[in-house]
Each structure stands twice: as C-alpha cells, then as structure tokens.
Amino acid sequence: LVFRVHIVRMVPTVNDPELFALIRLLDDPDENVFEPVFNRIVQYGYRAIPQLEHVWETAEQADQQVRVESIIRRIQYLEIAQRYQYWRQQSSPDLWEGLLILDQLYHREDRTEILRQSMEQLRRNAWLELNQYLTPLEQMNVLSRVLFEHERFKGIDSAREKIASHFIGDILTNRIGNQVGLGLLIQILAEKLDLSLYALSVPGIFVLGSPNVIKSREKKGIDSIDFYLDPQTGELFGRAEIELYMRRIHQPLEESFFEPLFAKQLVEWWLRKVAQKAQESGDLILA
C-alpha cells in the first residue's frame, strides 16, 4: 500500500535548507541522531509533509520509510489534538464538528468536505419525508424508516464490531456502525432536522430519548421522556421496556440516568470507547 497523506488544504512547499538537511539525516541509523531530527521536523508541521512524502516514495530502505511515516503521523496527531482542544474550549461545541475532527485519528486523509456533503444529502432525504403536522413520535418513525429502510443503515453488535464502526465517516460511507457510532449519527441528524432527540446516561447501553417539552418543565428523570430509540435497529420503545431493562441490571430509576448528554460528554465517552477497542484489537490509530 502506498503511504500518502491526501491533504485537502493547500500546503506550501517549504524551500528551507535546514529542512532539507534534516531530511537527509533520516537515513542515519543512529537513534541518538534520529530523535532530535524527528522533533525538529515535527515543528515544521504540515509544511514539511510534501517533502516527507517525496522522501517516502523514493526511499530505498524500509527503515527510512518507517521513520518518515512516524514523523507524518506525529504531525497529523498534533494538528488534530490542537483542533480538538480548540473545539473543547468552546462553551457549546457542535457534536458533528468534533467528530469530524476526530475522524482523522483513523483516516490519514482529510475527508471533511466529502463527509459534509454525505451528511447534507442524508439530512435532505429525511427532511423531504417530514412535515410540520407529524407528532414527535411520528417524526421519529419517519427518521428511523429513512435511515434503516431507505438508506439501509445497519447496526452490529459488540462481538462483531471493529474500530472503524465507531467513526462517523466510516458509518456514513459503509452504512454500518455499532451502537455508539450509529447513536451519535442519529443524534446529529436529529439536531440538523430540529427534532428533539438526545443521548441519555442510561447505564450499560447507548439509548436516545425524546423528552416531552411541556412535561420536562415540571417533571424530571424518566417522567420527562416520552419514548426511546434503539440506535442499532431504529426501533422505538416506551417506559415499560426501559423499566424492565433497569430491573434486569438491578439499577434504580435515578434522575441522572435520563438527563441528556452534551457534546463534550459524548465525545469524551466516544474517545474512551475507541481507545478501549484499539487496545483490544491492536488496530492502529494516530498517536
């Protein structure tokens, strides 16, 4: 496989004698030489990548290619980390934007614009099926039908999931995702359609709930939720099913379990799930 970094943004080629000299040192077998060279090239950031790609393509030794790959991965990781920290510092960050940034942890190429177009097409397809006269329950039935019947999205269980099934870009492209990934996709789509649907803190599962706007002003916890959506299947269910589940796992119906999770909480939870799966499977993400 050819190792290339497809960068959508325009990256200027650096005509810097120091960078050229540093790159020539990459074939030095001495690790004591490589470490400071590695750190200095990384400081150039994305500007160094065109030259690094050229070195990778023309390298005669596999060891040199491995070194170049490690530098490029480090540059990418630091760029993603910087953008993610900026996202986290916002008072009300957008969930969709956060997941777009983190998509590059697994995919080296920047697919942002392609994924934006895919999401917009999905939003439009769902919007065409909705109208203002539908009840919230009817609206969710329409959304579920569009996703799981028309668009043919499919959920997979934890035993068969791969790390790719967590990432929003892969789910949009392949139409397959795990419970968490599909749940986040559905919540994002609901937000774009101005539908009231939020991820909840119910232990052990990822479930979406639709709060009753009027009831939620007066009541809390389970009493404020009208119905629930299973992101793996798109099925809607009610209070009786969630109460049965809570009895099975021996959990009380605490109010906090039925409060919506916000973007920062969801992304941090998602990151923990991805890290856990990467450790279990040995899949490589940028680090």
Task: Describe the function of each predicted region.
Residues 10-287:
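A structural boundary/capping signal
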